[in-house]
Amino acid sequence: MTDCRLYLITPPALDDLAAFGHDLAAALDGGDVAALQIRLKDAPDDIIAAAVQVLSPIARARDVAVILNDRPDLAARLGCDGVHLGQDDMPLAQARKLMGPGAMIGVTCHDSRHLAMEAAEAGADYVAFGAFFPTTTKDAPTTADPEILSIWQETMEIPSVAIGGITADNAAGLAAAGADFLAVSAGVWKHPQGPAAGVAAINAAIAQGLEARLAARGG
């Protein structure tokens, strides 16, 4: 791929789902977003289901794919477009059986090309590397170097997602390095001018990074 797009992740808790739905609509109207990952770690099934039921129509009305974190069983039952798996979650082959051949399945690979290649061979639709920067959204067991994005971009067809502490101030370098998607949570939801401005700022940084990527390749 020679493009890079925003992969938006929900905050870790949604205390007021209706209010967040308005924030999500504003964010998605702020610029290009490829996918929304609903990530509610350790939340009860009914809370996750309620979030999917409220947020999915908002995303899909704007052609944004809906990915559920960790739970292929719920993702299949709730009709999500895909699921994101951690290294300690359900095996990819089992998730594929639940989700079907058309679902998007991504896998966290930390800072390891070996894990990413295993995921690719198992049929992952994308691999996620990180964390690239300090993050308070989730515990990050590894720190990744942007070089892994460049190597992956040059050698593999499956898209890569960069994750971990990404904001408008540091996104351009990851887009330039070769990331196909930038996974962002707090960089949008905690943007000082609001989530719509956060999405717009990330997209502007991505455009800057893609210009640098093309220039480095002599384009």
UniProtKB/Swiss-Prot annotation:
Binding site for 2-[(2R,5Z)-2-carboxy-4-methylthiazol-5(2H)-ylidene]ethyl phosphate: T135, T136, T137, G165
Signal peptide range: none
Keywords for the protein's UniProt record, in alphabetical order: Magnesium, Metal-binding, Thiamine biosynthesis, Transferase
A cellular-component GO term for this protein: cytoplasm
Cysteine pairings via disulfide bonds: none
Top EC class of this enzyme: transferase
EC number(s) reported in the record: 2.5.1.3
Pathway(s) served: Cofactor biosynthesis; thiamine diphosphate biosynthesis; thiamine phosphate from 4-amino-2-methyl-5-diphosphomethylpyrimidine and 4-methyl-5-(2-phosphoethyl)-thiazole: step 1/1
Residues reported in the UniProt entry to bind 4-amino-2-methyl-5-(diphosphooxymethyl)pyrimidine: Q37, I38, R39, L40, K41, N69, T108, K138
InterPro entries, sorted: Aldolase_TIM (IPR013785), ThiamineP_synth_sf (IPR036206), ThiamineP_synth_TenI (IPR022998), TMP_synthase (IPR034291)
Catalytic activity as recorded in UniProt: 2-[(2R,5Z)-2-carboxy-4-methylthiazol-5(2H)-ylidene]ethyl phosphate + 4-amino-2-methyl-5-(diphosphooxymethyl)pyrimidine + 2 H(+) = thiamine phosphate + CO2 + diphosphate; 2-(2-carboxy-4-methylthiazol-5-yl)ethyl phosphate + 4-amino-2-methyl-5-(diphosphooxymethyl)pyrimidine + 2 H(+) = thiamine phosphate + CO2 + diphosphate; 4-methyl-5-(2-phosphooxyethyl)-thiazole + 4-amino-2-methyl-5-(diphosphooxymethyl)pyrimidine + H(+) = thiamine phosphate + diphosphate
GO MF annotation, one: magnesium ion binding
Binding site residues for Mg(2+): D70, D89
Entry cofactors: Mg(2+)
GO terms of biological process kind: thiamine biosynthetic process; thiamine diphosphate biosynthetic process
Cofactor annotation comment: Binds 1 Mg(2+) ion per subunit.
Family statement: Belongs to the thiamine-phosphate synthase family.
Role this protein plays: Condenses 4-methyl-5-(beta-hydroxyethyl)thiazole monophosphate (THZ-P) and 2-methyl-4-amino-5-hydroxymethyl pyrimidine pyrophosphate (HMP-PP) to form thiamine monophosphate (TMP).
PANTHER family, sorted: THIAMINE-PHOSPHATE PYROPHOSPHORYLASE, THIAMINE-PHOSPHATE SYNTHASE
Protein name, entry field: Thiamine-phosphate synthase
Gene for this chain: thiE
